[in-house]
């Protein structure tokens, strides 16, 4: 849970600056010039890693600008981009990623806290379908209002993004989407100037840690357990309920399902301080000690593979990637009972 003392709300003046630059961007209609995969990489002053901007709306009806911070953020971008080809539920990916996103949308979709800011600044939009609002996404938390640091980051980012879009409009830069080209804007400290150029879009994969159980005595104990004719499915899902706090959290549910005889083996919410790796590994150790080595584990979530690849190989348990559609049914049933 976020420490209340660490969160600072943005001032009215900061919000005004953010809306001022966003309204300038709005007039340029950046979605007419950049596709959502044509990332704009901006290396801001005094920041070690760049930010990556994805402009949405050229190929869909939803207009917006998503900003991903650093290499980890770039991994989140590609994780979401690959959602249509993968097996992880779209809602899970939204709850799993971190970004600062601006939407152009219906007045009815504007969060209450954002509406208060808009009213206080007395901002008027063209139609009820053209309201501009901002959402902070953070892994494990509910979408929330931007804080002071996030507003400041977007102001600086959008000021530079404006220069990029204007250069594309004027024909000074011409990234080709078919060639997977984006744009880089960076500050040159040697000559104290900003430079912009077309470059191939950077690529990155979302990194998931993998672990090796170091307790050799425990590993041998697990390996020597009898093997039983059982196939187990493991999965994670974020529940659509809210855990109150300075920033409300998304409860993360761990599930183990008996895919041989049918039925849930265990289902529990991760506690404060727990994580996907420790919970998955903890289940494996406890289950094998009590019941024996399952024959197969099926999963679609990369956290599970990071936790179990090494120990499953050591214990001769097949760890298999599978869409595990049955878990979507289980999740739907769980959610319906909330």
Which residues make up each language-model segment?
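Secondary-structure boundary/capping micro-motif
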Residues: 1-254, 259-338
């Amino acid at each position: 849970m976020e420490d209340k003392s660490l969160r600072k709300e943005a001032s009215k003046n900061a919000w005004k600056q953010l809306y001022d630059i966003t309204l300038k961007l709005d007039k340029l209609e950046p979605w007419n010039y950049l596709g959502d995969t044509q990332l704009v990489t901006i290396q801001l002053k005094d920041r070690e890693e760049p930010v990556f901007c994805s402009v949405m709306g050229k190929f869909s009806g939803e207009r917006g600008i998503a900003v991903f911070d650093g290499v980890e953020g770039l991994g989140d971008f590609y994780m979401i981009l690959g959602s249509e080809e993968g097996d992880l539920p779209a809602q899970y990916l939204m709850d799993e990623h971190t970004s600062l996103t601006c939407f152009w949308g219906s007045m009815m979709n504007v969060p209450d806290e954002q509406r208060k800011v808009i009213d206080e600044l007395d901002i008027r939009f063209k139609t009820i379908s053209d309201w501009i609002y901002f959402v902070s996404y953070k892994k494990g938390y509910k979408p929330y209002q931007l804080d002071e640091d996030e507003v400041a980051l977007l102001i600086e980012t959008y000021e530079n993004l404006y220069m990029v879009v204007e250069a594309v409009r004027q024909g000074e830069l011409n990234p080709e989407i078919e060639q997977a080209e984006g744009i880089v804007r960076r500050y040159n400290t040697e000559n104290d100037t900003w430079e912009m150029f077309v470059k191939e879009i950077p690529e990155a994969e979302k990194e998931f840690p993998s672990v090796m159980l170091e307790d050799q005595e425990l590993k041998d104990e697990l390996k020597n357990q009898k093997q039983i004719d059982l196939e187990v499915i493991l999965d994670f899902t974020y529940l659509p309920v809210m855990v109150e706090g300075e920033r409300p959290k998304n409860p993360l549910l761990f599930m183990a399902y008996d895919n041989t005889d049918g039925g849930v083996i265990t289902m529990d919410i991760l506690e404060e301080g727990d994580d996907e790796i420790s919970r998955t590994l903890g289940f494996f150790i406890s289950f094998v000690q009590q019941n024996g080595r399952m024959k197969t584990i099926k999963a679609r979530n990369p956290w599970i593979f990071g936790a179990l690849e090494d120990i499953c190989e050591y214990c001769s348990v097949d760890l298999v990637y599978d869409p595990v559609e049955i878990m979507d049914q289980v999740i739907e049933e769980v959610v319906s009972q909330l």
